[in-house]
């Protein structure tokens, strides 16, 4: 039986080895590239696969149609997921006739979701386990194939329980995989009434509340002990981490957070005292409790506290879905530059936002909006402003995958809009300049211009009409149910991190990235239909400043408004853009590392995009609404934008790749 495996971490290594031992043929393994910001104390699936001579891949988005097609070509009989961190699309789950199966680190249906290992310790459970279950669209909700219980000892911490679960997983897989290979796959439906769901844990969740019962504080220490980030508290402004502790007898009449003694180091909780056995001050070394007290300058009677507040006013919480995208990562940077904003984000990757992952006001979860509905609903309820930025927005995908464009761009985003209506949250929705379609106005006005698209047999319009329909639904919710909204329409924003050269290689990128790839690889620049189509190119910095002002919404002037964000002065044809780009390329200091210019090549849009494509001659915005509502005016010249975008991509090319 041929298997394709998705795996990561120690559990991934155990799963791969168990599948091999059971006599399966492994066609390929999909894993993750290690994150430099993460403590990778665990085994490497990629090294294991390489040593076994098995093809291994680590795509940023395994659910992209390109990868779905490649997995389909492998023709797997069965699919396994062992601690792979991204949920798999239904397209992938349906590729294997025998089904797709996931190993989860709890006794389902309890502790669905993220970090069950840590959550069971936080909650003081005495038992957990591992479960192999059939994969369905909803996370961890499929029929149970087999499970194995694991007792949690009172002295277990996260790492010891992790090792127990790995052993239990191997025993479970050794027992059930041969049976499954013969076609005998047990299936027991989960009882939804018993289901519990837990989200991802973040380092800041380790902050100790000394007003909690001592058992609760001790369990938190156990749950996040090394190599996890640790439970922590503050002595004044000095942070310290507790790595191990024990529960002591009652501390009657002592205020929670008070130091009872320094040798041993004991701190009062709500109903007892926590003895700190080992700990660490700041970024120092791990020491015993009494030495930690000395390092911190603690004396009996001192009070430990929460971190000092920077302001008495609660920060504005902004939820960005698609935070790793072009607009999302630049907007995050702008918001975090202001002290009064906190950003919550979800995306299927984190390469563009890696620079924010350790920021105390940035909270990120890696996930898919089509799957993590519980997390999204919770955070819509929690946050003040919601920006659903997830969309397929590259023209070649409109003709290649029109149904997927509709499902993601309309159906999934409609669900998020309905959450905003339900919890009465403000939504700032990214419409698109594409909604104007083949409008004949000299400049497109948000409130007056007609929205004109082509015939049904031209699927390139699926993106435009999906966005337009959502615009109309949002408007109706505002009129009929009081939804607070602003629609913004970007006009050809450009800048660093627009997309990637690897996306351009498979044709799934914006125009300028494709042109830069041609220059980098020494291939002809393709001018679709001669490149005479005109667009108004807008610098990402100008665009983000306008979007930031929409979020600020001074005087509520943006409520119920549609706002074009573009630079009418930066109008140019694609051919003019290519010529300007070539001129900047020839002057760049890295020019000598790349091949000679291969010339321009005129290509028919039908041959490039497919028969379902139809282009637009011009697209120029009226920005009167932006001027009136935002006091905004774009200021960055197109040449500056082109040069900065080009520089970013050229410096991202590996030196060895340049030389080749």
Swiss-Prot record:
Tell me the residue numbers annotated for binding (6R)-10-formyltetrahydrofolate.
114, 136-140
Positions annotated to bind UDP-alpha-D-glucuronate: 393, 398, 432-433, 460, 492, 526-535, 613
- Any idea which UniProt keywords this protein has? Antibiotic resistance, Lipid A biosynthesis, Lipid biosynthesis, Lipid metabolism, Lipopolysaccharide biosynthesis, Multifunctional enzyme, NAD, Oxidoreductase, Transferase
The active site of this protein is located at 104, 434, 619
Give the residues the record marks as binding NAD(+): 347, 368-369
Site residues (Transition state stabilizer), renumbered to this chain: 102
* Subunit field text: Homohexamer, formed by a dimer of trimers.
Q: Quote the protein name from its UniProt record.
A: Bifunctional polymyxin resistance protein ArnA
The species this protein belongs to is: Salmonella choleraesuis (strain SC-B67)
């Amino acid at each position: 039986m041929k298997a394709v495996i998705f795996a990561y971490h120690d559990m991934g290594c155990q799963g791969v080895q168990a599948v091999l031992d059971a006599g399966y043929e492994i066609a390929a393994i999909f894993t993750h590239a290690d994150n430099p910001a993460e403590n990778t104390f665990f085994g490497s699936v990629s090294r294991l696969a390489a040593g076994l001579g098995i093809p291994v891949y680590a795509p940023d988005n395994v659910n992209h149609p390109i990868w779905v097609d490649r997995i389909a070509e492998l023709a797997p009989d069965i699919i396994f997921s062992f601690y792979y961190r991204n949920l798999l699309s239904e397209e992938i789950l349906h590729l294997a006739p025998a089904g797709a199966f996931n190993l989860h680190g709890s006794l389902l249906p309890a502790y669905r979701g993220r970090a069950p290992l840590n959550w069971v310790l936080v909650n003081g459970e005495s038992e957990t386990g591992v479960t192999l279950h059939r994969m369905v669209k909803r996370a961890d909700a499929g029929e149970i194939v087999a499970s194995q219980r694991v007792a949690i000892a009172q002295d277990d911490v996260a790492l010891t329980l992790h090792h127990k679960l790995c052993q239990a997983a191997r025993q479970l897989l050794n027992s059930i995989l041969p049976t499954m290979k013969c076609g005998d796959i047990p299936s027991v439906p989960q009882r939804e009434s018993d289901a519990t769901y837990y989200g991802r844990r973040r380092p800041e969740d380790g902050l100790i509340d000394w007003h909690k019962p001592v058992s609760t504080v001790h369990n938190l220490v156990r749950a996040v002990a090394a190599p996890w980030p640790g439970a922590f508290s503050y002595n004044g402004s000095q942070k310290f981490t507790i790595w191990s502790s024990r529960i002591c007898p009652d501390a009657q009449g002592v205020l929670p957070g008070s130091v009872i003694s320094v040798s041993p180091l004991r701190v009062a909780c709500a109903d007892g005292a926590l003895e700190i056995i080992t700990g660490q001050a700041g970024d120092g070394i791990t020491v015993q409790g009494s030495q930690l007290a000395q390092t911190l300058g603690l004396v009996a009677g001192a009070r430990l506290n929460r971190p000092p507040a920077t302001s008495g006013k609660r920060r504005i919480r902004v939820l960005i879905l698609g935070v790793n995208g072009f607009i999302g990562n630049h907007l995050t940077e702008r918001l975090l530059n202001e002290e009064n904003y906190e950003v919550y984000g979800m995306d299927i990757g984190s390469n563009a936002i890696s620079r924010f992952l350790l920021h105390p006001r940035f909270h990120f979860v890696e996930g898919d909006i089509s799957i993590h509905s519980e997390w999204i609903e919770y955070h819509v309820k929690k946050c003040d402003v919601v920006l659903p930025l997830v969309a397929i927005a590259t023209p070649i995908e409109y003709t290649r995958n029109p149904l997927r464009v509709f499902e993601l761009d309309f159906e999934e985003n409609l669900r998020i809009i309905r959450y905003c209506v339900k919890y009465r949250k403000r939504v700032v929705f990214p419409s698109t300049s594409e909604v104007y379609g083949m409008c004949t106005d000299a400049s497109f006005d948000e409130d007056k211009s007609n929205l004109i698209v082509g015939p049904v047999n031209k699927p390139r319009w699926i993106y435009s009409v999906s966005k337009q329909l959502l615009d109309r639904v949002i408007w109706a919710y505002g009129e009929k149910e009081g939804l607070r909204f602003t629609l913004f329409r970007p006009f050809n924003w450009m800048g660093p991190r627009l997309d990637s050269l690897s996306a351009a290689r498979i044709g799934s990128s914006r125009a300028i990235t494709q042109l830069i790839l041609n220059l980098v690889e020494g291939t002809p620049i393709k001018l679709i239909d001669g490149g005479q189509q005109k667009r108004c190119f807008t610098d990402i910095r100008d665009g983000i400043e306008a979007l930031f002002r929409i979020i600020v919404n001074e005087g509520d002037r943006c409520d119920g408004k549609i706002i074009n964000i573009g630079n009418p002065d930066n109008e140019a044809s694609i051919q003019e853009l290519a010529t300007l780009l070539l001129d900047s390329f020839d002057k760049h200091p890295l020019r000598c590392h790349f091949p000679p210019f291969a010339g321009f090549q005129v290509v028919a849009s039908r041959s490039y995009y497919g028969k379902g494509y139809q282009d637009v001659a011009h697209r120029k915005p009226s920005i009167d609404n932006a001027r009136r509502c935002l006091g905004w005016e774009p200021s960055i010249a197109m040449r500056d934008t082109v040069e900065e975008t080009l520089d970013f991509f050229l410096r991202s090319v590996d030196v060895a790749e340049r030389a080749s």
